[in-house]
Amino acid sequence: MLGKGIKKSWGWLGLTVLLLGSPCGWAAEFSASFKGTDIQEFINTVSKNLNKTVIIDPTVRGTISVRSYDMMNEGQYYQFFLSVLDVYGFSVVPMDNGVLKVIRSKDAKSSSIPLANNEQPGIGDELVTRVVPLNNVAARDLAPLLRQLNDNAGAGTVVHYEPSNVLLMTGRAAVIKRLVDIVNTVDKTGDREMVTVPLTYASAEDVAKLVNDLNKSDEKNALPSTMLANVVADGRTNSVVVSGEENARQRAVEMIRQLDRKQVVQGGTKVIYLKYAKALDLIEVLAGNGTSGNRNSSSSNASRPSSPRSGSSSNSNSSSGSSGSSSGSSSSSSSSSSMGFGSAFGSTSSSGGRTITIQGKEVTVRAHDQTNSLIITAPPDIMRDLEQVINQLDIRRPQVLVEAIIAEIQDADGLNLGIQWANKRAGMTQFTNTGIPISTAVIGTDQFRSNGTLTTAYASALSSFNGVTAGFYRGNWSMLLTALSSDSKNDVLATPSIVTLDNMEATFNVGQEVPVLTGSQTTSADNIFNTVERKTVGIKLRVKPQINEGDSVLLQIEQEVSSVADSNSSTNSSLGVTFNTRTVNNAVMVTNGETVVVGGLLDKTSVESNDKVPLLGDIPWLGSLFRSKSQEVRKRNLMLFLRPTIIRDPGQFQEASINKYRSFNNEQQQQRGEGNGVLDNNTLRLSGGNTYTFRQVQSSISDFYKPEGR
């Protein structure tokens, strides 16, 4: 045995070191005894024996007294060193470079204490920090209990991090290991068995809310949360799901069964004032939730007044070039009140009603048209369900402003030139495409010479003929020259706009009522009796918008542009007037605020007729005296533009109205400045900054529209 000792005037130190021989080296054992020794001297002695570099904080002062009767190896000797310092309020903090720092224990919390884990938990009185996750217990609730078991006055501390539900514990390794064992024992899954309680009379949502409110009251009265059951309502099956500790679960189930009892009062009556929906319409929807009965005396279909399914605007006796707009909306106040239902509600104050059966319970729903309200008599649970349905249906429906541009251009060029000859003895050359046959002219002239009157056929031919006709009638010879060059244009321009509710059909109609002869008969007194019907011609626009997801609008369109054919048209006959009709029936999907071309037509018709006398008509120069030529070229262009704008609130509606008024007012002022008080349709505008002009539409088809041979 090798002995080593240090003696001071204020104390003594004895230390014995044993070196055990082995083939590879020596193993050291230590025995220590200190009495009244300066603590810094004690630290220096241990540092020298363990061959460690130790930094001593200046605040480390005092004397120690300790004695060891057993022999210790290096590990035990180091733990003995840590325990002595812990008793006197000091701690050792190891550094990354192997240096040890001796500081006061209360200052060690902010030092770089090693992070321990299950593989390296630390030994004895070493300072360590552990991060312990919790799975079943709230770290916030467990942390205060663990602080009481740790050395909070010294280097120990316990904090929790609620977002991750973890504990952060710092202290002596042995103490922290004991705290971790306690946490693992407490953090276990409790009894979470679930029980489903079906309800017969009560509402699952109401029962679950009531039981949870009682649990919150118990929690405030310091009842542990583990002793409370979790209660969740299943509205689909009208049942309540209960989970938790067995005793808490049994208490909750018993409470639920006590609440699920048949009510003495089977029903109540409530008046619900609607804000936007129509009471008569909602009756049909609510009646679809149950089995309809025939107990009520009045049927909703019989007493329901005929309500228009769409908003409409019309104008008659107007010119083709026009623009107009119309809108419709509805609103009403909202409130509800409970009241008794007696004979005060007779057939004069309510219109329409149904008695239906929902979940085996009788429900009566009536509509009061004057106040746009519903009178419902139903059990409380059914009443709540109906109120939820009504609140979801009684909403402000968005509106759609539909703006259209209808541009139609017609151009017709015609040429009619011919010469007809006649001889009373030799015959005649007659061409029917000239408008006046020479035979009619000769017979009419003979009668006029004899008695001074015209034949009916001659008078009719002259009244319907346009152009120049000239000739001579001398002796047996007569000649008739007819000439007509026509150039007609017809422009139909309109910018109708209409506002309608979502999924509501709207109609715009601007036109004239044109009389059409449908029959004629002669009475016994030789009076002619005519039967006349009137046909509407003009511009008709019928649209039904449907707002879809993503602010897209599905437009169902029915558009018609009709007019009376020109009197010079070849399609006109003595049977009556001819109508030009263009119809578009379509459905398109348009994004809110975008313009779409719904339909278009580019049409060209050419008719040419050449009549001549054989051989004579082919003679150069002189052949023109024996020919008749008729030529007609018609071109027609029709385009229809639509632009929907969704209006969801009154502010957007007001803005759209102001923009329309300003556009109209500016055009009116401009026309008045030019000396014309009536707006022309050379410029067609859509709101939102998009402008389309008649000339732009015309120029886009200019290649097709160029006149030929002119």
From Swiss-Prot:
> What span is annotated as the signal peptide, if there is one?
1-27
UniProt-annotated stretches for the region Secretin? 401-648
GO BP terms: namely:
protein processing; protein secretion by the type II secretion system
Statement: the UniProt record of this protein carries the keyword Signal: yes
Q: Where do the record's region annotations for N2 lie?
A: 192-262
Keywords associated with the record: Cell outer membrane, Membrane, Protein transport, Signal, Transmembrane, Transmembrane beta strand, Transport
Q: Does the keyword Transmembrane apply?
A: yes
- Annotated spans, N3: 288-399
Q: Where is this region: Disordered?
A: 289-353
Which residues does the annotated region (N0) include?
A: 28-105
Name the InterPro entries on file. Bact_Secretion_Sys_Channel, GspD-like_N0, GspD/PilQ, NolW-like, NolW-like_sf, T2SS/T3SS_dom, T2SS_GspD, T2SS_GspD_CS
Q: Where is this site: May serve as a pivot that allows opening of the central gate for substrate egress?
A: 511
Q: Which Gene3D superfamilies match?
A: 3.30.1370.120
Main localization category? membrane
- From the UniProt entry, list the residue stretches annotated as the region N1: 123-190
Q: Where is this region: S domain?
A: 691-710
Which compartment or compartments is the protein found in? Cell outer membrane
The record's Gene Ontology cellular component field reads: cell outer membrane; type II protein secretion system complex
Report the protein's function.
Involved in a type II secretion system (T2SS, formerly general secretion pathway, GSP) for the export of proteins. Required for the translocation of the multiple pectic enzymes. This subunit forms the outer membrane channel.
**Record family assignment:** Belongs to the bacterial secretin family. GSP D subfamily.
Q: Subunit arrangement?
A: Forms a cylindrical channel with 15 subunits. Interacts with pilotin OutS.
Task: Please give the NCBIfam families that the UniProt record associates with this protein.
Answer: type_II_gspD
Protein name in UniProt: Secretin OutD
Species for this entry: Dickeya dadantii (strain 3937) (Erwinia chrysanthemi (strain 3937))
Gene of origin?
Answer: outD
